[in-house]
Amino acid sequence: MAGPLWRAAVFIQRHRTSLLVGSCVGLFGVQISFHLFPDPIVQWLYQYWPQGQPAPLSPQLRSLFQEVLKDIGVPSGHCYKPFTAFTFQPVSAGFPQLPAGAVVGIPAIFLGGLVTNIDHTVVIHGQKVDWQSPAGTRLRDALTLSHDAQKFALAKEVVYLESGMAALQTLPAPVCLAGTWAISVGAKHALGLYGGPMSLRAAFNLVAIVVGYVAYAFSKDSLTVALEGWLDHRTASLSAAYVRGGVEFYEKILSGNLALRSLLGRQGEKLYTPSGNIVPRHWFRINHLPYTTRRDSLLQMWRAKVSPGHF
Protein backbone atom coordinates (compact mmCIF):
# COMPACT_ATOMS: atom_id res chain seq x y z
CA MET A 1 0.00 0.00 0.00
CA ALA A 2 2.90 2.34 0.82
CA GLY A 3 4.33 1.95 -2.69
CA PRO A 4 1.35 3.37 -4.64
CA LEU A 5 0.78 6.10 -2.05
CA TRP A 6 4.41 7.11 -2.19
CA ARG A 7 4.41 7.21 -5.99
CA ALA A 8 1.22 9.28 -5.96
CA ALA A 9 2.75 11.70 -3.47
CA VAL A 10 5.89 12.05 -5.56
CA PHE A 11 3.82 12.62 -8.72
CA ILE A 12 1.72 15.29 -7.03
CA GLN A 13 4.80 16.97 -5.60
CA ARG A 14 6.50 17.02 -8.99
CA HIS A 15 3.50 18.28 -10.98
CA ARG A 16 1.66 20.22 -8.29
CA THR A 17 1.59 23.51 -10.20
CA SER A 18 0.19 21.90 -13.35
CA LEU A 19 -2.36 19.96 -11.30
CA LEU A 20 -3.41 23.13 -9.50
CA VAL A 21 -3.87 25.09 -12.72
CA GLY A 22 -5.76 22.22 -14.31
CA SER A 23 -8.02 21.84 -11.28
CA CYS A 24 -8.82 25.57 -11.14
CA VAL A 25 -9.54 25.71 -14.86
CA GLY A 26 -11.67 22.58 -14.57
CA LEU A 27 -13.72 23.98 -11.68
CA PHE A 28 -14.31 27.22 -13.55
CA GLY A 29 -15.10 25.43 -16.80
CA VAL A 30 -17.61 23.01 -15.31
CA GLN A 31 -19.56 25.83 -13.68
CA ILE A 32 -19.46 28.24 -16.61
CA SER A 33 -20.28 25.65 -19.29
CA PHE A 34 -23.93 25.64 -18.21
CA HIS A 35 -24.10 29.31 -19.20
CA LEU A 36 -21.87 29.11 -22.27
CA PHE A 37 -24.08 26.43 -23.84
CA PRO A 38 -27.55 27.04 -22.36
CA ASP A 39 -29.47 25.90 -25.41
CA PRO A 40 -30.78 23.23 -25.54
CA ILE A 41 -29.67 21.96 -22.08
CA VAL A 42 -31.80 24.34 -20.01
CA GLN A 43 -34.81 23.92 -22.27
CA TRP A 44 -34.52 20.13 -22.02
CA LEU A 45 -34.51 20.40 -18.23
CA TYR A 46 -37.37 22.87 -17.75
CA GLN A 47 -39.55 22.72 -20.88
CA TYR A 48 -43.27 22.38 -20.17
CA TRP A 49 -44.74 19.31 -21.91
CA PRO A 50 -48.55 19.20 -21.74
CA GLN A 51 -50.04 16.02 -23.20
CA GLY A 52 -46.64 14.76 -24.33
CA GLN A 53 -45.83 17.74 -26.56
CA PRO A 54 -43.58 20.74 -25.83
CA ALA A 55 -45.71 23.81 -25.26
CA PRO A 56 -44.88 26.68 -27.65
CA LEU A 57 -44.43 30.12 -26.18
CA SER A 58 -47.83 31.80 -26.25
CA PRO A 59 -48.26 35.32 -27.68
CA GLN A 60 -49.25 36.51 -24.21
CA LEU A 61 -46.00 35.33 -22.61
CA ARG A 62 -43.92 36.58 -25.54
CA SER A 63 -45.52 40.01 -25.26
CA LEU A 64 -44.88 40.06 -21.51
CA PHE A 65 -41.22 39.20 -22.04
CA GLN A 66 -40.77 41.85 -24.72
CA GLU A 67 -42.33 44.41 -22.41
CA VAL A 68 -39.77 43.56 -19.73
CA LEU A 69 -36.87 43.80 -22.18
CA LYS A 70 -38.10 47.24 -23.24
CA ASP A 71 -38.43 48.44 -19.64
CA ILE A 72 -34.86 47.39 -18.86
CA GLY A 73 -33.50 48.83 -22.10
CA VAL A 74 -31.80 45.67 -23.36
CA PRO A 75 -29.73 46.38 -26.51
CA SER A 76 -31.21 44.97 -29.69
CA GLY A 77 -28.07 42.97 -30.38
CA HIS A 78 -28.44 40.85 -27.25
CA CYS A 79 -29.88 37.40 -27.92
CA TYR A 80 -32.68 35.95 -25.77
CA LYS A 81 -34.57 32.71 -26.36
CA PRO A 82 -37.69 32.48 -24.17
CA PHE A 83 -39.61 29.23 -23.76
CA THR A 84 -42.48 27.88 -21.66
CA ALA A 85 -41.30 26.24 -18.42
CA PHE A 86 -43.11 23.94 -16.00
CA THR A 87 -41.56 25.64 -12.95
CA PHE A 88 -43.32 27.97 -10.53
CA GLN A 89 -40.64 30.66 -10.99
CA PRO A 90 -38.69 31.79 -14.08
CA VAL A 91 -35.39 30.08 -14.86
CA SER A 92 -32.51 31.36 -16.94
CA ALA A 93 -28.95 30.72 -18.07
CA GLY A 94 -26.44 32.08 -20.54
CA PHE A 95 -24.80 35.32 -21.59
CA PRO A 96 -26.96 37.43 -23.93
CA GLN A 97 -23.88 39.27 -25.18
CA LEU A 98 -22.40 36.08 -26.67
CA PRO A 99 -23.48 34.38 -29.94
CA ALA A 100 -25.06 31.45 -28.05
CA GLY A 101 -27.26 33.95 -26.23
CA ALA A 102 -29.34 33.32 -23.13
CA VAL A 103 -32.47 31.29 -22.50
CA VAL A 104 -35.30 32.26 -20.17
CA GLY A 105 -37.97 29.83 -19.04
CA ILE A 106 -41.29 31.59 -18.45
CA PRO A 107 -43.62 29.60 -16.15
CA ALA A 108 -46.75 28.28 -17.83
CA ILE A 109 -48.68 29.27 -14.71
CA PHE A 110 -48.27 32.90 -15.79
CA LEU A 111 -51.09 32.12 -18.22
CA GLY A 112 -53.37 31.36 -15.29
CA GLY A 113 -55.11 28.31 -16.75
CA LEU A 114 -53.06 25.74 -14.85
CA VAL A 115 -53.89 27.41 -11.57
CA THR A 116 -57.57 28.18 -11.95
CA ASN A 117 -58.41 24.69 -13.22
CA ILE A 118 -58.86 22.56 -10.10
CA ASP A 119 -59.12 19.41 -12.24
CA HIS A 120 -55.50 19.79 -13.34
CA THR A 121 -53.30 17.24 -11.54
CA VAL A 122 -50.13 18.59 -9.96
CA VAL A 123 -47.70 16.35 -8.07
CA ILE A 124 -45.19 17.97 -5.71
CA HIS A 125 -42.56 15.84 -3.96
CA GLY A 126 -44.54 12.73 -4.85
CA GLN A 127 -47.85 13.98 -3.44
CA LYS A 128 -50.89 15.02 -5.44
CA VAL A 129 -52.16 18.50 -4.62
CA ASP A 130 -55.77 18.69 -3.46
CA TRP A 131 -56.81 22.06 -4.87
CA GLN A 132 -60.06 22.06 -2.88
CA SER A 133 -58.37 21.77 0.51
CA PRO A 134 -57.58 24.96 2.49
CA ALA A 135 -53.85 24.53 1.81
CA GLY A 136 -54.54 23.79 -1.86
CA THR A 137 -56.66 26.92 -2.17
CA ARG A 138 -53.87 28.94 -0.57
CA LEU A 139 -51.33 27.45 -2.96
CA ARG A 140 -53.54 28.23 -5.96
CA ASP A 141 -53.82 31.83 -4.81
CA ALA A 142 -50.04 32.03 -4.25
CA LEU A 143 -49.38 30.86 -7.81
CA THR A 144 -51.64 33.54 -9.28
CA LEU A 145 -49.47 36.61 -9.87
CA SER A 146 -50.49 40.05 -11.02
CA HIS A 147 -49.01 41.61 -14.14
CA ASP A 148 -46.55 43.66 -12.06
CA ALA A 149 -45.39 40.62 -10.09
CA GLN A 150 -44.87 38.62 -13.28
CA LYS A 151 -42.83 41.46 -14.76
CA PHE A 152 -40.67 41.67 -11.65
CA ALA A 153 -40.00 37.93 -11.72
CA LEU A 154 -38.94 38.06 -15.37
CA ALA A 155 -37.00 41.32 -15.04
CA LYS A 156 -34.99 39.83 -12.20
CA GLU A 157 -33.78 37.07 -14.50
CA VAL A 158 -32.96 39.49 -17.31
CA VAL A 159 -31.00 41.78 -14.98
CA TYR A 160 -29.13 38.72 -13.72
CA LEU A 161 -28.19 37.72 -17.26
CA GLU A 162 -27.31 41.23 -18.40
CA SER A 163 -25.04 41.84 -15.40
CA GLY A 164 -22.92 38.73 -15.99
CA MET A 165 -23.39 37.61 -12.39
CA ALA A 166 -23.13 33.99 -13.49
CA ALA A 167 -19.43 34.44 -14.27
CA LEU A 168 -18.81 36.10 -10.92
CA GLN A 169 -20.48 33.24 -9.05
CA THR A 170 -18.06 30.72 -10.57
CA LEU A 171 -14.99 32.39 -9.02
CA PRO A 172 -15.11 31.29 -5.33
CA ALA A 173 -14.28 27.62 -6.03
CA PRO A 174 -11.09 28.11 -8.12
CA VAL A 175 -9.96 31.12 -6.07
CA CYS A 176 -10.34 29.27 -2.76
CA LEU A 177 -8.59 26.21 -4.19
CA ALA A 178 -5.63 28.27 -5.37
CA GLY A 179 -5.55 30.24 -2.12
CA THR A 180 -5.66 27.12 0.02
CA TRP A 181 -2.82 25.57 -1.96
CA ALA A 182 -0.64 28.70 -1.82
CA ILE A 183 -1.15 29.26 1.91
CA SER A 184 -0.64 25.60 2.81
CA VAL A 185 2.59 25.36 0.79
CA GLY A 186 3.89 28.58 2.34
CA ALA A 187 2.96 27.43 5.84
CA LYS A 188 4.65 24.06 5.38
CA HIS A 189 7.82 25.78 4.20
CA ALA A 190 7.71 28.18 7.15
CA LEU A 191 7.15 25.37 9.66
CA GLY A 192 9.75 23.13 8.08
CA LEU A 193 7.28 20.32 7.48
CA TYR A 194 8.87 19.31 4.18
CA GLY A 195 11.82 17.97 6.12
CA GLY A 196 9.61 16.00 8.50
CA PRO A 197 7.62 12.78 8.20
CA MET A 198 4.99 12.43 5.48
CA SER A 199 2.29 11.60 8.05
CA LEU A 200 2.69 15.05 9.60
CA ARG A 201 2.37 16.74 6.20
CA ALA A 202 -0.69 14.60 5.43
CA ALA A 203 -2.33 15.71 8.68
CA PHE A 204 -1.52 19.33 7.89
CA ASN A 205 -2.96 18.94 4.39
CA LEU A 206 -6.16 17.52 5.84
CA VAL A 207 -6.53 20.53 8.13
CA ALA A 208 -5.82 22.85 5.19
CA ILE A 209 -8.53 21.15 3.12
CA VAL A 210 -11.09 21.63 5.90
CA VAL A 211 -10.13 25.29 6.34
CA GLY A 212 -10.23 25.79 2.57
CA TYR A 213 -13.73 24.32 2.34
CA VAL A 214 -14.96 26.56 5.15
CA ALA A 215 -13.48 29.57 3.36
CA TYR A 216 -15.14 28.47 0.12
CA ALA A 217 -18.55 28.00 1.76
CA PHE A 218 -18.35 31.36 3.50
CA SER A 219 -17.20 33.27 0.41
CA LYS A 220 -19.71 31.62 -1.92
CA ASP A 221 -22.66 32.14 0.42
CA SER A 222 -21.64 35.72 1.19
CA LEU A 223 -21.32 36.50 -2.51
CA THR A 224 -24.67 34.89 -3.31
CA VAL A 225 -26.47 36.78 -0.54
CA ALA A 226 -24.92 40.10 -1.59
CA LEU A 227 -25.72 39.56 -5.27
CA GLU A 228 -29.33 38.55 -4.56
CA GLY A 229 -29.84 41.69 -2.49
CA TRP A 230 -28.34 43.83 -5.26
CA LEU A 231 -30.42 42.03 -7.88
CA ASP A 232 -33.69 42.77 -6.09
CA HIS A 233 -32.75 46.41 -5.56
CA ARG A 234 -31.64 46.87 -9.17
CA THR A 235 -34.83 45.30 -10.54
CA ALA A 236 -37.12 47.23 -8.22
CA SER A 237 -35.41 50.51 -9.11
CA LEU A 238 -36.89 50.31 -12.63
CA SER A 239 -40.16 51.85 -11.47
CA ALA A 240 -42.67 51.94 -8.64
CA ALA A 241 -44.66 49.21 -10.39
CA TYR A 242 -41.66 46.90 -10.18
CA VAL A 243 -41.27 47.61 -6.46
CA ARG A 244 -44.93 46.80 -5.91
CA GLY A 245 -44.60 43.69 -8.05
CA GLY A 246 -41.52 42.58 -6.13
CA VAL A 247 -43.28 42.85 -2.78
CA GLU A 248 -46.18 40.80 -4.13
CA PHE A 249 -43.84 38.28 -5.74
CA TYR A 250 -42.07 37.44 -2.48
CA GLU A 251 -45.31 37.55 -0.49
CA LYS A 252 -46.74 34.96 -2.85
CA ILE A 253 -43.60 32.79 -2.59
CA LEU A 254 -43.82 32.82 1.21
CA SER A 255 -47.54 32.07 1.11
CA GLY A 256 -46.99 29.23 -1.36
CA ASN A 257 -44.22 27.74 0.77
CA LEU A 258 -46.47 27.82 3.83
CA ALA A 259 -49.17 26.06 1.82
CA LEU A 260 -46.66 23.40 0.74
CA ARG A 261 -45.50 23.05 4.34
CA SER A 262 -49.06 22.15 5.27
CA LEU A 263 -49.72 19.94 2.23
CA LEU A 264 -46.52 17.88 2.60
CA GLY A 265 -46.82 17.25 6.33
CA ARG A 266 -43.58 16.25 8.03
CA GLN A 267 -41.65 16.52 4.79
CA GLY A 268 -42.93 20.06 4.39
CA GLU A 269 -41.73 20.96 7.88
CA LYS A 270 -38.25 19.79 6.90
CA LEU A 271 -38.29 21.87 3.71
CA TYR A 272 -39.89 25.13 4.88
CA THR A 273 -39.74 27.21 8.06
CA PRO A 274 -42.90 28.49 9.83
CA SER A 275 -42.29 31.87 8.17
CA GLY A 276 -42.14 30.37 4.66
CA ASN A 277 -38.39 30.48 4.09
CA ILE A 278 -36.51 27.47 2.74
CA VAL A 279 -34.69 25.41 5.37
CA PRO A 280 -30.94 25.42 4.58
CA ARG A 281 -29.52 22.04 3.61
CA HIS A 282 -26.55 22.57 5.93
CA TRP A 283 -26.85 24.19 9.35
CA PHE A 284 -23.63 26.17 8.91
CA ARG A 285 -24.48 27.62 5.49
CA ILE A 286 -26.83 30.31 4.17
CA ASN A 287 -27.21 29.39 0.51
CA HIS A 288 -29.65 32.18 -0.32
CA LEU A 289 -31.01 35.41 1.08
CA PRO A 290 -34.20 34.55 3.05
CA TYR A 291 -37.42 35.43 1.25
CA THR A 292 -38.65 37.38 4.29
CA THR A 293 -35.54 39.57 4.09
CA ARG A 294 -36.01 40.14 0.37
CA ARG A 295 -39.66 41.03 0.84
CA ASP A 296 -38.95 43.40 3.74
CA SER A 297 -36.20 45.15 1.78
CA LEU A 298 -38.53 45.82 -1.14
CA LEU A 299 -41.29 46.82 1.25
CA GLN A 300 -39.02 49.54 2.62
CA MET A 301 -38.36 50.74 -0.93
CA TRP A 302 -42.10 50.82 -1.61
CA ARG A 303 -42.84 52.80 1.55
CA ALA A 304 -40.10 55.27 0.64
CA LYS A 305 -41.65 55.79 -2.80
CA VAL A 306 -45.20 56.33 -1.55
CA SER A 307 -44.29 58.44 1.50
CA PRO A 308 -45.29 62.14 1.28
CA GLY A 309 -41.66 63.21 1.67
CA HIS A 310 -40.77 61.37 -1.53
CA PHE A 311 -42.86 63.76 -3.56
Curated annotation (Swiss-Prot):
Keywords: Membrane, Mitochondrion, Mitochondrion inner membrane, Transmembrane, Transmembrane helix
Cellular compartments annotated: Mitochondrion inner membrane
Gene this protein is translated from: Tmem177
Main function: Plays a role in the early steps of cytochrome c oxidase subunit II (MT-CO2/COX2) maturation and is required for the stabilization of COX20 and the newly synthesized MT-CO2/COX2 protein.
Positions in the Mitochondrial intermembrane compartment: 39-164, 219-311
Protein family (similarity comment): Belongs to the TMEM177 family.
Originating organism: Rattus norvegicus
All ranges on the Mitochondrial matrix side of the membrane: 1-17, 186-197
Membrane topology, record value: Multi-pass membrane protein
Gene Ontology cellular component list: membrane; mitochondrial inner membrane
Subunit-structure text: Found in a complex with COX20, COA6, MT-CO2/COX2, COX18, SCO1 and SCO2. Interacts with COX20. Interacts with COX1, MT-CO2/COX2, SCO1 and SCO2 in a COX20-dependent manner.
Entry keyword annotation includes ATP-binding: no
Segments traversing the membrane: 18-38, 165-185, 198-218
Name the UniProt record assigns to this protein: Transmembrane protein 177
